[in-house]
A protein has these predicted regions:
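Short, aromatic/basic amphipathic alpha-helical patches
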Residues: 19-22, 41-51
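Short amphipathic alpha-helix with an adjacent loop that forms part of the alpha/beta core around
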Residues: 63-73
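N-terminal beta1-alpha1 ligand-phosphate binding loop
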Residues: 4-23, 35
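Short internal beta-strands
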Residues: 28-35
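Donor/substrate-binding cores of folate-linked one-carbon enzymes
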Residues: 74-138
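Short acidic-hydrophobic, aromatic-tinged amphipathic segments that line or gate anion-handling sites
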Residues: 55-61
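Residues that mark the start of a beta-strand
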Residues: 2-4, 94
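Short, conserved loop/helix-junction motifs that constitute active-site signature segments
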Residues: 22-27, 88-91
């Protein structure tokens, strides 16, 4: 039986969604947010939702959304680049993929920050979603 997940994010970390699907996860709902389509995009997320017939919400995810996901049997919420704080609940496990090594790369522009700090390497961090941005257990 496939694990039912919800995915929250933009195109920057679309490969996370691709990997989840390739490994047998069933995406029951997608969430994204408006982007400027200059430096950040959501065209791959929206195209995927349309081609697969998956519901897509382009607004902040709310506690009502989380309750609906739980009712639909969602077993995991995965985030890969999202501008808004996600309400924390114990009803659904939640994980975020952040495009830097935490805690050093905290913030909304981690790759630019790594360059400005002169870091020689960086990476990606998976962590539990907590009340504060980029604060959950790694």
């Amino acid at each position: 039986m496939k694990k039912k997940i919800a995915y929250v994010g933009i195109d920057l970390l679309f490969p996370v969604l691709e990997a989840l699907v390739a490994n047998g996860c069933e995406v029951i709902e997608l969430f994204s947010c408006p982007t400027d389509n200059v430096t950040e995009f959501n065209t791959r997320i929206t195209s995927y939702a349309n081609s697969e017939g998956i519901p897509l919400k382009m607004e902040r995810i709310t506690e009502v959304d989380l309750a609906r996901l739980k009712e639909k049997g969602c077993q995991l919420l995965v985030c890969g680049g999202y501008y808004y704080r996600i309400p924390v609940t114990d009803a659904i496990p939640m994980v975020n993929f952040h495009p830097s090594m935490l805690p050093e790369g905290r913030g909304s522009w981690p790759m630019a920050t790594a360059l400005l700090k002169g870091l020689k390497s960086s990476g990606i961090t998976a962590h539990k979603i907590a009340k504060g941005f980029d604060e959950g257990d790694i």
